[in-house]
Amino acid sequence: MYPLKFKPILKSTLWGGERIIPFKQLDCQQEQVGESWEISDVPGDESVVAEGADAGKNLTQLMEEYKGKLVGEENYKRFQGKFPLLIKFIDAKQDLSIQVHPDDELAMKRHQSMGKTEMWYIIDNTGGQAHLYSGLKKQITPQKYADMIENNTICDALDKYDVQPGDVFFLPAGRIHSIGAGCFLAEIQQTSNITYRIYDFNRRDKNGNLRELHTELSKDAIDYTVSDDYRTHYEPRKDEPVELVSCPYFTTSVYNLTETMNMDYSELDSFVIYICMKGACTVTDNEGNRISVKAGESVLFPATTQNLEVVPEGEVSFLETYV
C-alpha cells in the first residue's frame, strides 16, 4: 500500500464561508462552503482516492480489500470493518447551531451507529473576531435545560470562548457546543453524522422554514457535568511532537517542523493521518513511496507503514492522528 490522498467532499451550508476553496487551492466554483470532508467512510459520503493504483476506489472499498493492512488488525476488529475517523475542515461565516452528539451506547440504541466524540484545532480566527461555545458554565437540570430551550436562553448556560489560531478544544460525546462565526478549523471525530440540534437562533433555511430541532432527543444525550475550563492547554514547540488529545477514539499531536524528522510507527497497529495546516513538506515511507503535502491537504498512511521521513519546505505545521 501507499500514502493515500482523497478527493475532498465539499458541503455548502447555511452558515458556510469562502475560505475552504482558496485554502485547499481548488479550481472550482461553489458558494458558502462550510465543510470539506477530507477522509470519510460515512454512508453516502465515502471519500474517493485521488491518485495512484487505487484511484477511483472509495474508502469503503479500500476497507473491504485491505482490512487490517489499512487500519490495523485490532482497529479492523474493533470497528467491525468501518473506518473509524472522519476528518473535516470547517469554515463558519455565521454561528452554527447549538448542538450535542450522543455517545456510543445511545447512538447504537437509537441509530445503530457510533457516537461522536470530536476535537477542534483553530486554524484562523478572522482577525480576532471568532468565538465558540463549549460546555456548560453553570449547573442545570434536564428540566431547567428544557425551560431554557423554550425561552431561547440556552446560550446563557454555555461557556463562550474567543479563540486564537492554535487553540484546541476536546469535545467528548454529550458536551453541548457550537462553532461560532469567524472560526476556521480542523475537526477530527468518530465516523458518525448524528447531530442533535438544540437551538438555531430562530434562523430559516433557503425555503424560509425554521430548521428542525431535536429538543427531546438531546435531553438525555447531554452530559450535565460542569467544568471550569473546556479549552485544551499545551505548550507549542518546534521540531518535536506535542500531544493535544489522547482518548479511546483517537490520539492527536501537532508538529511545527523546520527540519527533517523521522517518524517511527513500527510499533503502532493503526493507520496515521496527517492534516496539513500551514506550509508544505515531502514525506517518504519505508517502501520508498514519496508524496508532497501542502496546506489544506490530508494524507492517510496505511497501518503497514513502518516509518516516515518528513522534509519541510521551510516550515510546515500539521496534525498527526491515529487510533
Region roles according to the model:
Residues L158-F170, D285-T304:
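Short acidic-glycine-tyrosine-enriched beta hairpin
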Residues M148-Y196:
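Loop-centered beta-sheet repeat module
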Residues K82, I90-D95, D104, N125-G128, ...:
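Ligand-binding loop in jelly-roll beta-barrel domains
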